[in-house]
Amino acid sequence: TSQRPGTLSIRTETLKSLLMDVVEALYRQGLRNFVVLSGHAGGTHNAVLIDAGECLLSRLPEAKIAVVTEYDLAAEEGKGLIETVGDSHAGEIEASRILATRPHLVKEGAVEAYPAFPKHILVRNKQAYWPSAVWGDPSKASAEKGRKIEEVVVDALERLVVELEEFVEPAGC
């Protein structure tokens, strides 16, 4: 979606450096448990966050780190709510969540779409393959579903925080 109006992109190196700098600063101040919660479900973006987390684990001996996207939590925890298989950007999940909080931002009439990019080939003009910016079925969205999704995401995040706090890594390697 980097070619869409309103999108601000940063280089992966910048994202990694920013995350590492923030976590290291907080670690120096005494924090030890870190949940990196991303609102973006892009594969490259998440790979960078995981890579930064792995680097931080090797540099900060007492740190515990979890990396998760709120979208993954919504998809995993909302299995009984979500009707669309393969739902993603501006689809059922995202449209429902926005309908629950900022309904005026949801464009009416968005149609179901599942873009097909060339397999294994990187493309410059992503809009040629993904003209609508929709990946999923926004017609199945509702404000009520969005509120329920928000609840399950918060519950899952609370469980993750507790799990991370209680996590004891096995010794040795």
Where are these regions (language model features)?
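Extended, histidine- and acidic-residue-enriched regions that form the cofactor-binding/catalytic faces
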Residues: 1-35, 39-173
